[in-house]
Amino acid sequence: MQIDCTLAKVATRRVGADAGERSDDFLICAIAKGDKLSMKVLFARHNVRVYRFALRLTRDESLAEDVVSEVFLHAWRGAKNFQAKSKVSTWLLAIAHNKAKDALQRRRHEYLSDDEAAAIEDPADNPEAIFSKKERGTLLQECLTKLPAAQREVIDLVYYHHKSIEEVAQIVGAQASTVKTRMFYARTRLARTSLYRNP
């Protein structure tokens, strides 16, 4: 089932309608018709999330940037084929998952060090939050790097990207029961370390 763009046509006629206020579904409809402004808005909304996800998967800043470019190029070209079975953000992360896997197969030998990954900051944070985040982030990174890639990816999607089990299943191309199993084993492994704490 594709998105119904009928409402998008009505909203397009609205005088003074700001692209930044529109829903992701509306933006996809507009992008499918070649609207570059809507593509810019979609990119601005989601590029950081996609980049961080790609960076966690690839552990390489340059490779993650390439993945982001490929994701949004794919979104531009494939907007007309978007199926409304999931949120646009879930669709973008699923594309990122596949593009990152492809990129890793091409460049298996390069990884981002744990120190570099922990140094990634959110520009919205204040100095205290940055310090606290770095401290916790370093400890958490140590634990997460010990997890198998499939478990690490599921933890990343659920806790960092706030995706549901069903959305994670769509992104990684697995059954929901498989995602739950990976979550269980990841939590069990993290619980075994003295560094893991429940929020």
For the regions a language model picked out, list residue spans one by one.
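Conserved RNAP core-binding helix
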Residues: 27, 43-44, 51, 61-78
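Sigma70-family region 2
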Residues: 32-33, 59, 70-87, 106-107, ...
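Structural recognition of an alpha-helix C-terminal capping motif at a helix-to-coil junction
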Residues: 52, 66-73, 86-98
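Residues in the helix-turn-helix
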Residues: 63, 178, 185
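DNA major-groove recognition helix of helix-turn-helix
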Residues: 68, 183, 190, 194
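Arg/Lys-rich amphipathic alpha helix in sigma70-family domain 2
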Residues: 80-84, 94-114, 133, 185
